[in-house]
A protein has these predicted regions:
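A polyanion-binding, active-site-adjacent surface
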Residues: 1-124, 128-133, 139-161
Length: 162
């Protein structure tokens, strides 16, 4: 769970933190890939397209789904959070184990929506942006924690390689 889409033209593609192939990696995504490598040993991909993770069952969701070009969080009051809160509540009602990564204060406010139902893993860390990555994002090891949780509950681990 992130915050809102990338706000530069050509970056946002409907998946939190993902950018289309060929688009330079935003700093937050570079930091995610650095943590992925440090945590799991998976080599950082050249492309920032995270579609393969989505196809493997990873929901890459921003609570706010649109943004004005060049203005981060500019659509925070447009009502998107009612929609995405309903999505999170529906996920929480599912019977299977679910692991959630809440990156940044905006995402962490959504934790109460995710705590009911079957076993849940709620990982909280600072946002991967360069402004906060050294305050606990680096070293948070979310990828290995997710896989340990899933396998402990009889679910297959996620292949994080892209």
């Amino acid at each position: 769970l992130g915050q809102d889409p990338y706000h530069e033209p050509g970056q946002a593609m409907g998946l939190a933190f993902s950018v289309p192939a060929g688009v330079p990696l935003p700093p937050s995504l570079r930091n995610i890939f650095r943590e992925l490598e440090d945590d799991t040993g998976v080599q950082p991909p050249r492309s920032g397209d995270l579609t393969a993770w989505a196809e493997r069952g990873v929901l890459l969701l921003n609570p706010v789904l649109t943004v004005e070009g060049g203005k981060a969080n500019s659509h925070a009051d447009w009502g998107w959070q009612a929609v995405t809160d309903a999505i999170l509540a529906a996920l929480s009602a599912l019977p299977q184990p679910i692991a959630c990564v809440l990156w940044g204060a905006h995402a962490q406010k959504k934790a109460p929506l995710l705590q009911s139902g079957a076993p849940r893993l709620l990982l909280r860390a600072p946002h991967p942006s360069p402004l906060s990555s050294y305050r606990g994002f680096f070293g948070s090891r979310p990828f290995s924690q997710i896989n340990a949780f899933l396998t402990a509950h009889g679910e297959p681990p996620i292949d994080w390689a892209l």
